[in-house]
Every structure is written in structure tokens, then in C-alpha cells.
From Swiss-Prot:
GO molecular function: ATP binding; glycine-tRNA ligase activity
Lineage summary: Bacteria, Pseudomonadati, Campylobacterota, Epsilonproteobacteria, Campylobacterales
GO biological processes: glycyl-tRNA aminoacylation
Alphabetized UniProt keyword annotations: Aminoacyl-tRNA synthetase, ATP-binding, Cytoplasm, Ligase, Nucleotide-binding, Protein biosynthesis
Record GO cellular component, one term: cytosol
Organism of this sequence: Helicobacter pylori (strain G27)
Name this protein carries in UniProt: Glycine--tRNA ligase beta subunit
Length: 701
């Protein structure tokens, strides 16, 4: 037998769920790196967790290390020996090389060639050694490599970790790993584990991976998080069937309850129906954020919107048989939470949205208050309303009035008691308060949708009206924060400006709104007139960089369009997609190299050209028939009215044949300077026309 199963359990105090889940994804990679570092070839690696333990299970862990050779290269022989033919031995420099390696016999030194030079050389052979001596150092290095964001110290221990470590249990090939002192964390190892607290508080000895799994299973610890998740989902499904309800599975919440339980049980509790008068989002948010409960809904047909049911699912970690006691305890806690929510909500309803003291809340240091932000957004919103009036299906005067009102009260709910308690309900509570205070329904809905989209694939504002309010918020935040230098760099983006920018582009693209990233940004910056001066090209470039996330496409095609003067968001997307369609077309896929060879040459000829240089040319100076042929084909395109981008691109790429013939027969760098200049100007004109679609030199095929 050359290998055996290795199991390592790291027993800790309760791990914070979110920190554990974030780092769990990185653990296999980090463990693999430690094995590779020591040239250990192992089998499958599995990592399990519960709130109290990390378990590393490695199949086919070798009993012995591999024999390895370590090579050392010293100084060149000609400066390390007393003479060039090496007969008089080593000088001080040569002796120093071997002394550093701890070698005393220098009589029979070796040499090797490195970088075409003969140098002193020594090879050290590392014999096979038992791997059992490597296990604890690997585990301790693994613990140091883990990054949970925060760590703590306890007692007089040397090292820190996210929570105190109580034991490291190593089970491998019947070896004894008891009583190894781990000074770094202040304990001695035991080949033992702990089980569910309701079963025992004591260590239980184990002598093999098989015994370890049996002990946990018998004592209500489900080690594998996938099995805990499956148990929860199965029990939820049974509750749905039994009680004729539907349960919305929140993925993040499910991951969290899996991470905080060792033996989960899904139980159904109820709350007083009187609480259903609250907006449903208050109830579901309170249940999720405060108690980690799943919301339940009345079962309806697929066409109907789900209605909140006065039930909740609590995932318990208890193993006692009296489930009703657990349910009653959770019902009591939820009742107190929802009673508080009713109090906050009713207090908020007494306060008119107009009266919210926005001037008392600082937006960002150096950027004024929420009232200042609201006033800036109002100017942006008026500009956008006039620009997109045809898409609003109402008279311009009415649209301007409603948009102004929406922006005026959009931030009022930030000062409400409910949003103070649940910040994720900003905008949503504004919607409910606006409806209760008889605001226009479009206005109310725009308050709810102003922060959309919340993530990459999240819903967008449901109308152009809401889109205008959402865009105003985003544009002001970008102008404001860029103007005071709060620009994202590297992984740092404290104001989530990348996500905000992506949302801005996605809204504009979805509704097909005209927005030029050069002209409109400049106009808005000047119209608002209160931002600190900064280079708008920095913001323009920042927004252009988001297109790679916006369009699923070969990045070089996106780059080719962005490398032109086109800055209208919708037109950029249309051109990228049209180029992609052309290049993906099976009839073009086989001849891409042929299509691009002439165009690449055209681009290379013009790569150093000054864009502002005159491109006038005269056909009277054309001497070759291929010049006339290319001009006629080019002129036919320039004077044609195309139905759309697809036919225009098809026509431009149709120039590849006359271009090929041109380059075969025409010498661009003619001895006659006038003819040379004329040919260059003509080719520049052809290239410039291509830039109406994309910069062909950027496209990688």
C-alpha cells in the first residue's frame, strides 16, 4: 500500500456564516497549492464544514514523499577557480559557494552550463520520507492561508484566527497524532471529535476516518453541507404539500442556515394575520434579516402573483422531540419584531414626505446634503424628460411636473423609521408612503424603482418614467463622486460605482434611449453647474469599460467599435451586435482570414495617420485600373442608402476583393510624391469610412 485516506478535523468555536461561505470557495485551491509546493500527488480532496468544524478529507494521500533533486548553481568557473583549467582547486569565491550549502569536501567539485557559461554546480538528492511528518505543518500553513476578513486572538496564543481553535484531529494510516503541542493556538492535539451539543459536550475518541464519520452520524451531526441542504429542502417540500402553501427559497438565506446548523430541521410557525396589513416587504425582510426565517405564500395559479401567508419556516438546529416548543419560542420572537415594525410604519405614515429634513443628512463629505443631491438630480431629470418626451406617452408639461415631484420626494424614506431599521427597504417604503399620501401612481412606482437594477441580472425600472428617475440618481452620483476623486481603483469600489454604471447602461440599452457619452455628459455637467471641475473623459472611459460586461461578445469586436468616434450607447451596442452577427455567420466563418487580410493592411498603412490631416484625393491622379475599380466599389457604398447595419457591413466587407487586387498591383509608396500622397489620402478615406462601424485593426479573429 502506497497511500491511505487522510482526514483532518479543525474544531473551532462557531464560525460566522458569511465569512465561512466566502472563504469556503477558496479552500480547495489553497490546499492543492500546499500539496503541490511539497510535490505531493494526492487523490480527490473534499472539504466539509459545520459551524463548529472544518473537515479535510484527502483520498490517496501518499505514505512517502517523492524522491526529488534540488539543484544549486554557483559562480562562473573562471572566477571561482585558482586557474582556468581547474587543476589548482577553488579560490575563496568558489569555497564560499560550497560552504553556504554546508559542504566540506570541495576536492571533487562539479560544474554545469547555465546561460552558456560553465558554473559551479551541486545537486542535492532528497530521499523519500514519511509524509506523516508533513501533515501538521501543512495544516498549520493552511490555517494561516485562510482569509476570513477578520481574525481574533485568545488567551496567550501566538497566532490569530477567525474563532478560537480547540483541537486538530488527524487520522491517517493508524499513526499516532495525539498530544502534539500546537503552541501557535494553545492546545495539544487529540484524535477525538465533538458531536452535537445536545448529545454530549465531551470529546469522543476516533481512530480512523470511518469511525469519525460513524460517530458524527450517530450523534446528529451531518458533516456534508450538501446533505444538510437536501434535508432542509425535502422537509420544506413536505410542509408545502401538507399545508397547501408555497415557500420562496432565498439562495443566500438557504446557504446561511446550512452554515449555522449541524442537524437542521425545517419547522412551520405562524404569526397573527393582523400583521399582514404591513407591506409584505417589511415582514419578509424582518424575518430574513433578523431571524433567518423563510417566508411562506398562499398557493395560487402560476398566472397570479403570490400573496404572503401568515406563516414562516424556521430551520432549527435542535434535536429535541418537542418541536412545538421551538415553534412557539420563534413565534414569540417574531411577534415582538413585527410589533416593532407596525410601530415604525405607523409613525412614518404620520409624516408627510414633503417634510423630510433632507438638509440634515450629509450625502458624502464635500458633496453637500441629501437636499443638495435631490436638487442636482432634479436638473438632470428635467433634461432627460425633455430628451425622452416622445417615449413618455403624456404631454411634456405634465411629464416635467411629475418627474420633478418624483425626484423631490425620492429620498424622503431614507429618514423613515422603517428604513432606519431595514436599509434594504429604501425606495420600497417610499413607494408605500407615496401611495398612502395619494401621490400619482407613476411617481410612487418610480420611488420604488429608482435603485434598480440591484445586480447584474436583476429587474430594471418598469417604464421610461421610472428609468428617468433612476438615471438621474445614477448620473448625479457619478458626477459627484468623480468630481471629488472617489473613483474606483483595483478591487476598491466603496460606492459601488461599477455596478451603478452597469445599471445606467443597461437601462438606456433596454429602452433604446439616445444618450451620447461625450455630448450628453458634457451638457449635463454644464447644466447642473455645481460639480467640482474634473476631466469628463475619465468618466467617459470608465463607462466605456463597462461594455465588456454589458455585451456577451468577443472583446475585440467591442474594442473595435469603442475605438471609433461613436459614443451613443444604443448605437455602440447595435454596431457590436451587427459585427458579431456578420462574423458568426457560417458563410463568413470559413473565410475570416481572407476577409481580414486586406483590411488589416489598410489599417496598418493608416496607423500613424493624423486624424485631422486632410484626406482629399483626385481620381485624375489614378494610374492603375485597380485604383479605379476600388474607387467605384467604394463610391457605390458611400452613395447607397442601406436598410440597416447588417447590409452596410456586408457591403463594406465586400470591398475585400477590390482591395486585394489593389494591393497586388498598386505601389502606394510611389516615387512621385504627388501620386503617393493621393493614394495615401484615398486609402485613408476608405479606412475612415470603415470607422463609421468599427476600427477593423482591433478585431482579433
Amino acid at each position: 500500500m502506497h497511500s491511505d485516506e487522510l482526514l483532518v478535523e479543525i474544531l473551532v468555536e462557531e464560525l460566522p456564516a458569511q465569512a465561512l461561505l466566502n472563504e469556503y470557495k477558496e479552500m480547495p485551491k489553497k490546499l492543492h497549492a500546499l500539496f503541490n509546493k511539497r510535490a505531493l500527488e494526492v487523490g480527490n480532496i473534499e472539504i466539509f464544514y459545520t459551524p463548529r468544524r472544518l473537515c479535510l478529507l484527502i483520498k490517496d494521500f501518499p505514505l512517502l514523499t517523492q524522491e526529488t533533486k534540488e539543484e544549486f548553481f554557483g559562480p562562473p568557473v573562471k572566477i571561482a577557480c585558482n586557474n582556468e583549467d581547474k587543476t589548482q582547486g577553488l579560490n575563496a569565491l568558489g569555497l564560499g559557494f560550497y560552504q553556504k550549502l554546508g559542504l566540506k569536501d570541495h576536492q571533487h567539485f562539479q560544474t554545469a552550463f547555465k546561460n552558456n557559461k560553465e558554473v559551479l554546480y551541486h545537486a542535492k538528492i532528497h530521499e523519500k520520507e514519511p509524509t506523516k511528518d508533513l501533515i501538521m505543518p501543512i495544516v498549520l500553513e493552511f490555517l494561516e492561508d485562510l482569509n476570513f476578513g477578520k481574525s481574533m486572538r485568545w488567551g496567550n496564543v501566538e497566532k490569530s484566527f477567525i474563532r478560537p481553535i480547540h483541537n486538530i484531529c488527524v487520522l491517517f494510516n493508524g499513526e499516532n497524532f495525539n498530544d502534539i503541542e500546537v503552541k501557535e493556538y494553545g492546545f495539544k492535539t487529540k484524535q477525538a471529535t465533538k458531536v452535537h451539543r445536545q448529545e454530549s459536550f465531551d470529546f469522543i475518541e476516533v481512530d480512523s476516518p470511518k469511525a469519525y464519520f460513524e460517530v458524527l452520524e450517530k450523534n446528529h451531526v451531518i458533516l456534508d453541507p450538501k446533505k444538510r441542504e437536501a434535508k432542509i429542502l425535502q422537509e420544506i417540500k413536505e410542509l408545502e404539500t401538507e399545508h397547501h402553501i408555497s415557500i420562496e427559497i432565498d439562495r443566500d438565506l438557504l446557504d446561511e442556515v446550512v452554515a449555522i446548523t449541524e442537524y437542521p430541521s425545517a419547522l412551520l410557525g405562524e404569526f397573527d394575520k393582523a400583521f399582514l396589513k404591513l407591506p409584505s416587504e417589511i415582514i419578509t425582510t424582518s424575518m430574513k434579516e433578523n431571524q433567518r426565517y423563510f417566508a411562506t405564500f398562499c398557493q395560487k395559479s402560476q398566472e397570479e402573483s403570490p400573496t404572503l401567508h401568515n406563516g414562516f419556516i424556521v430551520v432549527s438546529n435542535a434535536i429535541n422531540k418537542d418541536k412545538q416548543k421551538i415553534i412557539l419560542g420563534n413565534q414569540k420572537v417574531l411577534k415582538a419584531r413585527l410589533s416593532d415594525a407596525v410601530f415604525f410604519y405607523e409613525n412614518d405614515l404620520k409624516k408627510p414626505l414633503d417634510n423630510a429634513p433632507l438638509e440634515s443628512v450629509v450625502f458624502v463629505q464635500g458633496l453637500g446634503t441629501l437636499k443638495d443631491k435631490m436638487e442636482r438630480e432634479s436638473i438632470i431629470a428635467q433634461y432627460l424628460t425633455q430628451k425622452y418626451a416622445p417615449s413618455l406617452n403624456m404631454p411634456l408639461e405634465k411629464a416635467l411636473e411629475l418627474v420633478k415631484r418624483a425626484v423631490q420626494i425620492a429620498k424622503a424614506d431614507l429618514l423613515s423609521e422603517v428604513v432606519y431599521e431595514f436599509s434594504e427597504l429604501q425606495g420600497i417604503m417610499g413607494y408605500y408612503y407615496a401611495l398612502k399620501q395619494n401621490e400619482n401612481e407613476l411617481v410612487a412606482l418610480s420611488l420604488k424603482e429608482q435603485y434598480l437594477p440591484a445586480s447584474e441580472n436583476a429587474p430594471l425600472p418598469s417604464s421610461v418614467f421610472s428609468a428617468i428617475v433612476a438615471l438621474s440618481l445614477k448620473l448625479d452620483s457619478l458626477f459627484s463622486l468623480f468630481s471629488v476623486g472617489k473613483i474606483p481603483s483595483g478591487s476598491k469600489d466603496p460606492f459601488a460605482l461599477r455596478r451603478l454604471s452597469f445599471g445606467l447602461l443597461k437601462i438606456i440599452a433596454h429602452y433604446g434611449l439616445e444618450f451620447d457619452l461625450k455630448a450628453d455628459l458634457k451638457s449635463l455637467f454644464e447644466k447642473v453647474g455645481v460639480y467640482q471641475s474634473f476631466d469628463l473623459e475619465i468618466l467617459e472611459k470608465f463607462l466605456l469599460e463597462r461594455f465588456n460586461n454589458l455585451i456577451d461578445c468577443n472583446p475585440s469586436i467591442i474594442r473595435s467599435v469603442l475605438n471609433t468616434n461613436e459614443r451613443d450607447i444604443v448605437k455602440i451596442i447595435q454596431k457590436v451586435k451587427a459585427l458579431k452577427r456578420f462574423l458568426d455567420d457560417p458563410k463568413n466563418a470559413q473565410k475570416k482570414e481572407l476577409l481580414f487580410s486586406a483590411f488589416k493592411r489598410l489599417a496598418n498603412i493608416n496607423k500613424d495617420r493624423n486624424p485631422n490631416e486632410s484626406s482629399e484625393f483626385s481620381i485624375s491622379l489614378f494610374k492603375e485600373s485597380q485604383e479605379h475599380a476600388l474607387f467605384e466599389a467604394f463610391n457605390a457604398i458611400k452613395t447607397s442608402a442601406f436598410e440597416g447595419l447588417d447590409s452596410k457591413i456586408e457591403a463594406y466587407f465586400g470591398l475585400h476583393a477590390p482591395l486585394e487586387e489593389y494591393f497586388k498591383s498598386v505601389l502606394v509608396m510611389d516615387k512621385d510624391i504627388e501620386i503617393q500622397k493621393n493614394r495615401k489620402n484615398f486609402l485613408w478615406s476608405v479606412y475612415q469610412s470603415f470607422l463609421e462601424i468599427g476600427d477593423i485593426k482591433e478585431i482579433a479573429i
